[in-house]
C-alpha cells in the first residue's frame, strides 16, 4: 500500500503528483488501550496514530512552545535535542514538540535532524494555535521511512479539539531538568504509550514521574 499526495488544477484539467510513500504496514505489538486504572493521561490523540505499545520509557523530552517561539535561536534548540540524544546512551525517550518536527522552516517546527533522534521511540507533534493560526503538522512525513524502519511511534495532538488532550497542568506542576536550551524540558520517570490503529486513538501515560536537579 502507498500514500499519494497530489494537486489538481480544474481550469487546466492538470494533475501533479507531489509525493508518494509506502504506508506503515509492518507487524508490531498492538494491545489497544487498556483500562488505565487511574493512571494519568498526559497526551491524547484521535487520528493518524502509529499502532503500537511502549512500556517503561524513562524519559520524556518536551519543547515548551512559548519559550521556543520567544527566542530566535531555533537551531540551537534542535542541536540541543541532538546533545540530549547523545547523552541517552541507548536509553529511549519520548519527544514532544510543537508544530512540524524536522521542518526546514523553524517557524513551523523544530528543525531537528533524524540523526539527532536515534534514541527516540515516539514522536508527538502538538498542534497549538499561534497568533491566530494553527500550523499544519507533518504527520511524521519528514522522517516517514526512518520511523517505519526503526519502529518509532507517532501521534499528533491538537490543543482544544475534542478527544485530544495536552495536560498543561502536568507539564507545569512536575519538576523537570532544563536542557541545553531554556525551551527544552527533560522529565524523568516511567511513561507508557498506547496507540490503537483500529480506533485511531493514542495516549501517553505517566506511571510515576520524578526529576533530578
Locate each region found by the language model.
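Conserved divalent-metal-coordinating catalytic cores
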Residues: 1-213
Amino acid at each position: 500500500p502507498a500514500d499519494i499526495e497530489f494537486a489538481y488544477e480544474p481550469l487546466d484539467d492538470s494533475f501533479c503528483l507531489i509525493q508518494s510513500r509506502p504506508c506503515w504496514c509492518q507487524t508490531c505489538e498492538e494491545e489497544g488501550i487498556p483500562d488505565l486504572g487511574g493512571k494519568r493521561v498526559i497526551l491524547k490523540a484521535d487520528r493518524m496514530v502509529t499502532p503500537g505499545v511502549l512500556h517503561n520509557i524513562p524519559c520524556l523530552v518536551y519543547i515548551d512552545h512559548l519559550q521556543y517561539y520567544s527566542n530566535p535561536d531555533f537551531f540551537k534548540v534542535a542541536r540541543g535535542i541532538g546533545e540530549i540524544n547523545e547523552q541517552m546512551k541507548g536509553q529511549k525517550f519520548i519527544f514532544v514538540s510543537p508544530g512540524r518536527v524536522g521542518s526546514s522552516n523553524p517557524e513551523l517546527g523544530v528543525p531537528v535532524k533524524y540523526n539527532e533522534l536515534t534514541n527516540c521511540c515516539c514522536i508527538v507533534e502538538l498542534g497549538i494555535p499561534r497568533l491566530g493560526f494553527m500550523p499544519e503538522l507533518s504527520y511524521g512525513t519528514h522522517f516517514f521511512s526512518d520511523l517505519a524502519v526503526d519502529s518509532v511511534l507517532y501521534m499528533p495532538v491538537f490543543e482544544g479539539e475534542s478527544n485530544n488532550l495536552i495536560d498543561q497542568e502536568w507539564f507545569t506542576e512536575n519538576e523537570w531538568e532544563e536542557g541545553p536550551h531554556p525551551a527544552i524540558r527533560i522529565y524523568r520517570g516511567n511513561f507508557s504509550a498506547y496507540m490503537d490503529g483500529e480506533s485511531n486513538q493514542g495516549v501517553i501515560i505517566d506511571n510515576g514521574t520524578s526529576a533530578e536537579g
